[in-house]
């Protein structure tokens, strides 16, 4: 069976020459549909650069990336945009919510890009917010929500269009311990529902809660193990 994600000999080099930085240095990795994976590394390890590649937010200098059987290098900008809008739900450490929109409006945003009508958008966004326990906060703007609630809005936004892949970059990095548990439980439920969930993190406590841990250091994958 073809892996959902297949990366082979990927390089990303900044400042080529004497002072070059190999953010990704000959990285190869396969991830199958339905896996729950953490990509773990300290600051500067290359993990965020790798996330940008997996999310089709940036392009490597060399190497191959096949997503769902398609060579990403051969896709047009419109096709890449379509992947980001239909196949991948992004969750970021900084929430990235629009301050002047309420929770419902923030979750509706990716649905606008999909061309859905207003009523359909509201129904889907409302359902997504209910799934993350914010059915009573739909009309609240980000500054009226706690950090944990803001991240739950971000999760709802990521899952509203029902993408098969969830790509979460340090999703608990700005949260207290209670909110961290809540977000991880939501991500676990998303995995149980059949989605492929990939978490980028520096935190071993987060990594211990997933099925597979890929460690990256100095742009290289140094270990790939299954949690028992």
Show the residue positions of the predicted features.
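ABC family nucleotide-binding domain
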Residues: 2-216
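H-loop (His-switch) and adjacent beta-strand-loop-beta switch element
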Residues: 213-226
């Amino acid at each position: 069976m073809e892996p959902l994600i297949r990366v082979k000999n990927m390089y990303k080099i900044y400042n080529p020459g004497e002072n070059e930085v190999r953010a990704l240095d000959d990285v190869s990795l396969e991830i199958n549909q339905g896996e729950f994976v953490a990509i773990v590394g300290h600051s500067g390890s290359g993990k965020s650069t790798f996330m940008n590649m997996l999310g089709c937010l940036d392009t490597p200098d060399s190497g191959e990336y096949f997503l769902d059987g398609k060579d990403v290098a051969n896709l047009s900008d419109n096709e890449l945009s379509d992947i980001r809008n239909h196949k991948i739900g992004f969750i970021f450490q900084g929430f990235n919510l629009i301050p002047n929109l309420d929770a419902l409006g923030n979750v509706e945003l990716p649905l606008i890009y999909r061309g859905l009508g207003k009523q359909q958008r509201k129904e889907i966004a409302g359902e997504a917010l209910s799934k993350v326990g914010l059915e009573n906060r739909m009309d609240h703007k980000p500054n009226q929500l706690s950090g944990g609630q803001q991240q739950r809005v971000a999760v709802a936004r990521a899952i509203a269009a029902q993408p098969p892949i969830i790509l979460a970059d340090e999703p608990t990095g700005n949260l207290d311990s209670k909110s961290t548990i809540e977000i991880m439980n939501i991500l676990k439920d998303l995995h149980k529902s059949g989605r492929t969930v990939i978490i980028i993190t520096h935190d071993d406590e987060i990594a211990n809660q997933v099925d597979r841990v890929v460690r990256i250091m100095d742009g290289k994958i140094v270990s790939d193990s299954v949690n028992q």
